[in-house]
Swiss-Prot record:
Sequence similarity: Belongs to the methyltransferase superfamily. RsmH family.
PANTHER family for the chain: 12S RRNA N4-METHYLCYTIDINE METHYLTRANSFERASE, S-ADENOSYL-METHYLTRANSFERASE MRAW
Protein localization: Cytoplasm
Gene: rsmH
Lineage: superkingdom: Bacteria
Protein name per its UniProtKB record: Ribosomal RNA small subunit methyltransferase H
Natural source organism: Streptococcus pneumoniae serotype 4 (strain ATCC BAA-334 / TIGR4)
Length: 316
């Protein structure tokens, strides 16, 4: 595997083991990334089993073709270069009507963060980009330089939950009147100018939340996850499972809400039984999110904010 695609998979065994993999089953890795989850899942399949792996980043697919070569030779893997929000349409096109399990590792992957030219990191000077799909048209540059004040405030509050959203949006407006804001370093410095001294002393980079907000906007991450997870629940076979790893509160709240809605039912009191069409489709496999072990936290700094939630299909 090439150095630039080194990626330490978070919650590797927990995510796949909780899928209760059937050796002859059909499975999906919705977020191929460094292919760690895919590789471990494939190790649990027989040659009759099959994995469909999604990624909109061609570099990730190229890397995975090397890492998963032994399984590809056996015809056990199909790569799909597309946004996972098109999960159902892509799988139907591949002739798949039902799946036995699917895993999601939401957010940006380590290789994307580590590749300076992708413009995801506030720690490395690069053009403002942040596209997970390099063929997409909307970039971080467009958001920062063309969104009006009110739209900037909206995404900074909604996706970054930054209490200085208004001040940062105003400072961006002022800066871009002089010249376009072109690089990650320029943007990070503008954000630093707004934050008071006591905020700058806090743990974590002062630009982290704003960069997260712009990245989510550029890639419509929450909208895509919402659509995809709902499609996955529809496509699951009975007893099939979904594992979702999240890395920030917005992703986790979305996942928790989707799973809660699918696993609970509101019916009038006094009904002698629940009609089939009102029965919940899903069941929570774990009431609380599964967190990384102490060993993983020590070995991989990026696992600190990870949470894993799992549901099982109990009713069609």
């Amino acid at each position: 595997m090439t150095k630039e695609f080194h990626h330490v998979t978070v919650l590797l065994h927990e995510t796949i083991d909780m899928l209760d993999v059937k050796p002859d089953g059909i499975y999906v890795d919705a977020t191929l990334g460094g292919a760690g989850h895919s590789e471990y899942l494939l190790s649990k399949l027989s040659e009759k089993g099959h994995l469909y792996a999604f990624d909109q980043d061609q570099n990730a697919i190229d890397n995975a073709q090397k890492r998963l070569a032994p399984y590809i030779e056996k015809g056990m893997v199909t790569f799909i270069k597309d946004n996972f929000r098109h999960l159902q349409a892509c799988l139907r096109e591949a002739g798949v009507q039902e799946i036995d399990g699917i895993c999601y590792d939401l957010g940006v992957s380590s290789p994307q963060l580590d590749q300076r030219e992708r413009g995801f990191s506030y720690k490395k000077d690069a053009p403002l980009d942040m596209r997970m799909n390099q063929d997409a048209s909307l970039t971080a540059y467009e958001v920062v330089n063309n969104y009006d004040y009110h739209d900037l405030v909206r995404i900074f509050f909604k996706y970054g939950e930054d209490k200085f959203s208004k001040q940062i949006a105003r400072k961006i407006e002022q800066a871009r009147e002089v010249k376009p804001i072109e690089t990650t370093t320029e943007l990070a410095e503008i954000i630093k100018l707004v934050k008071p001294a006591k905020e700058l002393k806090k743990k974590g980079h002062p630009a982290k939340q704003i960069f997260q907000a712009i990245r989510i906007e550029v890639n419509d991450e929450l909208g895509a996850a919402d659509e995809s997870i709902q499609q996955a629940m529809d496509m699951l076979a009975l007893d099939g499972r979904i594992s979702v790893i999240t890395f920030h509160s917005l992703e986790d709240r979305l996942t928790k809400q989707l799973f809660k809605e699918a696993s609970t039912v509101e019916v009038p009191k006094g009904l002698p039984f629940i009609p089939d069409d009102l029965k919940p489709k899903m069941e929570l496999v774990s009431r609380k999110p599964i967190l990384p072990s102490a060993e993983e936290l020590e070995a991989n700094n990026r696992s600190h904010s990870a949470k894993l939630r799992v549901v099982r299909k109990i009713h069609k």
